[in-house]
Structure formats: structure tokens, C-alpha cells
Amino acid sequence: MKTIKLACSLDANQTYIIAVSGGVDSMALLHCLVAQKIKLQVVHFNHLARPNVWKDKELVQSYCLQNSLCFHYFELNCPQKNFQAQARLLRQQKLMQIATKHQTPFILTAHHLDDLAETILQKITRSSTLLGYSGMQIQTSWQDFIFLKPFLYVPKAKIISYAAFYQIPFLEDYTNQNFTYQRNQIRHQVIPYLKTQTSFLQNIPKYQQTLLQAYNFIRKQTLLFLTKHTNHSCNPPNSFALAPFLNLDLVIQKDIILLLLEQQNITKSFIFIQNIIKGINNPYKPNLSWHLNFEWHLIKDYKHITLMSPAPPLSFALSKPLLCVSTCNLCLACISPSLQSLNYNPQKVSFPLKVRLRQPKDTLKFSFGTKKLKKFLIEKKVPLTQRNNLWLVVDNLDNILFIPHLYINLTLGNQSKIYLAFKNFFTSSNCFSQTN
């Protein structure tokens, strides 16, 4: 009796959804699992891409009838542009739909060792991540579903031999000979050459497992870092401290950024990731921003790396606080627990006072002279994302008197004193140190 060793064990008490095209790979897997009395729901797809596709349906449906298997059929109308990727997504959706209907998370496909080799070579030609270079995995999880590839370490030749031994019916898809697709070029030109010259196919599982072991170790370090440093009480939401990140090995840094993107379903090129890492490690550019998609930006500032949504217009983002002024501190105590006293000479301050946001040419006054507000904020290492959200207290002549947590004008004299308090005041940080 000829048998095939599966890459993963299956539970006879569970139900499995299996995609069957009618080709030798999926028909051999179907035969193998029927022989093991595995509970199956068979799904067949018609991509409407070639004539006589109805023969595939008839073959699979007939086999299901002979073996008392449930048969599910879908026609997929995929656009010609990026056909293979679009078809793969549609198949995945339909398989998950059937799995949900039959209350099982398990979905089987007949990918084999030659497919794994093709995928690895294809990834190398296009560049990928460490996980990507490992090709396909025996088991992957997506949402609530578990995708299994029992034939992943079985060579195509062994599958063909198995099908011939048991006289399993199957049909060849002539589009697999279409050299328009890079995968078919690799399948029919590159891999046959490598098979004759080296032990290429036998070494593929070792190569894949070595990469997966390295990936799993790196990802474990990534998760340890994020668990320790993300959403710490001293950090803004969706952020982590810059300093410990810079102490990590570059490969861990890259994986942290990759994981942040994966969690938001964002796909970026190797070069894009490299540019992010280069920017984060550049000490001469403390404030940087990378546009990831319409929903997310990655922000570097003096102390943090933050994943955030693009800021809405300021008129919507900030609510202007109410400035309360009094010569009596007790009168303001009920408005805000944080009062700021301001000493001044009447001739140096023009009332009324008002509150506004920072403007490009703002200047601060000190006992030693003046300084541009922009330079002052850079020296104070105020993150770029926070600078435009600063509320300034100015007099009627637009002289800056006070910036909460940052600055108090001490050049105004000391003949009189007033107290300032904000109602409905919001600032994105309470960690600034005030300069006198």
C-alpha cells in the first residue's frame, strides 16, 4: 500500500473544509483524507478563465458523489489585472464562508514541496521579510480560521506517483504552462534545473525551518519589548520610548516596525522599512513623520515613536480654553487648581489678555534678550506634533506673557500681580518643565 506522510496530523472528530481544483495535487489529498475517514466539506472554484472548465467541476462533483462528500461550487469573476492575487483573495473568502457555515475553523489546501520552493524563489526575486522568505507555513491563522497544508513537505513527483498507484482521476490545467506568470517560469525552467544539479528540493524544508526559527526568536523579542514599553503610563497611546528602542539590534527594530504595520494591515516595501529605521536612528533629525496610509502616520519625536491618525484641522482638533484673570487667587481656585501668578508693571502690559495658538514669527523675551519661540521649543525638545497645539497667553499688543508648563515672561516688572487660570484647558503633555 502506498501512503503519504502528512505534515500535520488531522483529527477525525473535526470537520475540515478542503479546496479541490480537480488537479492531481488536490485530488490526491482528497483521496488520502477520505482513506483516513476525515470529515470533509469539498469546495471547488471555477475562475471562468479557460474553456472546458465544466469538466473540472464534473470530475470533482462525481468523486464527491461516489464518496458521499458534500460538494460546494463557486464561480469567481476576477479582473484580469493582478488576476492570481485577486483570485486567491476570493477563494479565501469563500472558504471562510463555508467554514463558518459548518462551524469549523479548519481549511485545507493541497500546496506541496514544489509549491513551497516556487514561493521561496519568487519571494527572493521580489524581496520580502524574514517570514516571507520562508515561503508558506504548514499552519497559519487568519481571523478565526486555521489554514493547513498537509502536503507541504511532499514532493510533486511523489504525489503523481501516489495518484498513479491508486488510479485517482484528475485533470491538468493548461494555464499552468502559461509563461506570462513568473511562477510558471520558475516551475518549468528554474526548479527542474536546480533539481538535476543539486539536492535543492530536499533542502527546502531545512531552509524554511531555519528561517522560521530565526523569525520566531526575533518576533518573541519584539513582543517582549512592546509588552514592556508600549502604552506605559509615561508614554502617549500607541507609542513607546525612543531611547530603549535605539538600544535594540537593528533586526529587532525592523521587526517592531513590521509588527506595528501588520497590526493595521499595512503592507510596505523593504526599502520603505529601511528608510524608517534609518530615520529613527538619525540623531540629527529628532522629529520625523512617515505617511503609512490614509488612516495612520508613524511619528518620531525626541522621546517617543508613535503610531497615530493624521491630525484633523486645528479648528476641529482643539477647543480654545477660557482664560480667567484676577488679582485674587482665591477667586480662581474654583476654576482651576493650577494657577499662574504674573508680576508686571502696568505700562508694560496692554490689556485685555487673550489666548491664541503659536504663530511662525513668535518671539519670547528674557532678561538676556529675545529668542524665537521656534528655537526655544527645539531647545526644550517639544515634539513637533505638539508645537502647533500650544496655547499662548498674550496681551493686546501680542506680547507673549505665558505658555503653560513652558514659559513665563519675567521681564514685565513687579509693581502689580495678577493670577491666570484656564477653564477647559487641554494640553497633550504635562511633562514640560517651565522656564523662568
UniProtKB/Swiss-Prot annotation:
Transmembrane found in the keyword field: no
Record's GO cellular component terms: cytoplasm
EC number(s) recorded for this UniProt protein: 6.3.4.19
KW Ligase (keyword) present: yes
Keywords: ATP-binding, Cytoplasm, Ligase, Nucleotide-binding, tRNA processing
Highest taxon of source: Bacteria
Top EC class for this record: ligase
Major location (coarse): cytoplasm
Catalytic activity: cytidine(34) in tRNA(Ile2) + L-lysine + ATP = lysidine(34) in tRNA(Ile2) + AMP + diphosphate + H(+)
Record function comment: Ligates lysine onto the cytidine present at position 34 of the AUA codon-specific tRNA(Ile) that contains the anticodon CAU, in an ATP-dependent manner. Cytidine is converted to lysidine, thus changing the amino acid specificity of the tRNA from methionine to isoleucine.
PANTHER family, alphabetized: TRNA(ILE)-LYSIDINE SYNTHASE-RELATED
Name the record gives this protein: tRNA(Ile)-lysidine synthase
Lineage: Bacteria, Bacillati, Mycoplasmatota, Mollicutes, Acholeplasmatales
